[in-house]
Amino acid sequence: LPQALRSEVARYWQAFGEAVGAGNREMPPDALLAQLVPVWGGSEFVARACIREPALLTGLTVSGDLATVNGPGDCAARLAQRLIDVGDEGRLMTALRQFRRREMVRIAWRDLAGLAGLVETLGDLSDLADVAVGAALDRLYAWQCQRYGAPRGADGQPQRMVVLGMGKLGGRELNFS
């Protein structure tokens, strides 16, 4: 890494150590530390997310999600698990933000550590967007139907809401722009 990035990563490391100590958490395993420099040097977002929530990095490590290629439905299954006890819009918004942050760190880490190629990274980002939008839509639609009744078309049939993913999402080409 260039010296400027090394200095930045050193500052991140110091802040991370303070956050870990303040929360009485354990430091990540040595194998993960070898990947930390290029990942944090390449992504301020990942570094700051880990500093803000040191348990995030530990959770990704313990779960094996940093080392594992996502299979079909893996992202959706993790989100479904996260949303089991969510019963209102405020908690849904919080859970979706936390899930997005966790998954974005996982995807970026795998990309920057050289554990995932371009196709995997683009696919994972697209899956994340797709399942998050779908989960939000399903819950919000159900809650609105409970409150106001299901919307009906001219023929009286219940109508669903639809979100169209076009462009990069529809083409499964979302990136970190």
Regions found by a protein language model. Give the residues of each.
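Non-catalytic regulatory/linker segments of enzymes
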Residues: 1-177
